[in-house]
Amino acid sequence: KKGLAQRLKAEGENSPADVILTVDIGRLYVYDDLDLLAPIDSKKLQNNIPNYLRSPDNTWFGLSKRARVIVVHKEKILEGDITRIEELADPKWKGKICSRPGSHVYNRGIMASVLAALGEEKAEKWAKDMVANFAKRPQGNDRAQVKAIHEGECEIALINNYYFGKLKFSEDPEQRKWAESVRLVFPNQAEGDRGAHVNISGGGIAKFSKNKE
């Protein structure tokens, strides 16, 4: 939640928090950098969660993974038309892409991934060129992007992969129709390519928890 780290920092030893759970590795780093997490001495966690999904000093652990993938209209976008995240910047997709706001942590994560892969100059150009392809002003959540594709507002978007499952098996028949309109594309899957961007949800024990045991 926005501002939670600052609140915990301000509360200090008086904080009532015991466990901190959050949806992005960037947020976990924020809590760690602010010294808000306590080391966890758990053989069960250490044996079951690999080193790359936890902090070096075991203050936080990844608990689930998700991929940021491309979702396309399954009839208007043919298989193979888009295979890499970089291709979203191609001018041929002008007016075809929908997006939730770039300020959201999910999109900041994918931007960081592209920045790490391409470098600052190329990543900035990619972002600007992709924005130029937007069909409308960024708005809504990931579900809203699938709905927009279903309703013909655009043909391409980025979503977390699990949202497709939520829609496909929704109790709401209208949401199931949205899912039926689209196809997921896991980008950058060719041999030697870096694969889709994967982020984590994770958590740790609050530094001043009274219930660490």
Where are the regions that the model predicts?
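A structural signal for short loop-to-beta-strand junctions that line the ligand-binding cleft
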Residues: 15-20, 38-72, 86, 97-99
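Ligand-binding pocket segment of bilobal, Venus flytrap-like solute-binding proteins
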Residues: 102, 106-109, 113-187
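Short beta-strand->loop
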Residues: 37-46, 59-61, 86-89, 173-197, ...
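Hydrophobic residues within well-ordered alpha-helices
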Residues: 8, 31, 149-150, 205
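Alpha-to-beta junction loops
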Residues: 11-20, 36, 93-95, 151-159
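A bilobed periplasmic-binding-protein/Venus flytrap-type ligand-binding module shared by bacterial periplasmic
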Residues: 69-76, 116, 188-189, 198-211
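Flexible hinge/capping segments at coil-to-helix
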Residues: 77-93
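Early extracytoplasmic/lumenal segment of secretory-pathway proteins
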Residues: 1-27
